[in-house]
Design a protein with these regions (language model features):
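Catalytic strand-loop segment that frames the active site of acyl-thioester-processing enzymes
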Residues: 4-47
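Compact, glycine-rich, soluble single-domain proteins
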Residues: 43-48, 52-53, 57
Length: 126
């Protein structure tokens, strides 16, 4: 496995087992003092969208024990900003289908009462 793109950006707290339906969830804790927030944005930190897509990829790659590269983000919706000072524990719900060296993934990043990101796309297995 490759090392995370953003070192110390998050810590995975818990992950459910893969189900027969190719679904699982993972709960991660964002690090509100990570250096990325000094530029995005110093007064009110907001998790950058690209880092959230990377988070979806890294947690999924770890779960299936494969290296992945993003092939296509066919439908990505950023529905609300994640301020890690207000809510740093988030859950990622996955549904996926592996076909040869490609994975179709649908993932949602949510908090206690809100969905932050909806992702539908494809990853290549290296």
């Amino acid at each position: 496995m490759t090392k995370p793109l953003l070192e110390d950006f998050y810590t995975e707290i818990v992950s459910t087992n893969l189900s027969a339906e190719n679904t699982f969830t993972a709960t991660v804790e964002l690090n509100p003092s990570h250096k990325i927030y000094k530029g995005h944005f110093p007064e009110i930190p907001v998790a950058p969208g690209v880092s959230l897509i990377q988070l979806i990829q890294e947690v999924f790659a770890k779960k299936i024990n494969q290296e992945l590269t993003l092939k296509e983000g066919s439908n990505i919706k950023f529905l609300a900003m994640i301020n890690p000072l207000k809510e740093n524990k988030i859950t990622i719900s996955y549904t996926f289908l592996i076909k040869d060296k490609e994975v179709d993934v649908t993932a949602n990043i949510s908090g206690k009462e809100i969905i932050y990101v909806k992702f539908k796309g494809k990853f290549n297995i290296k």
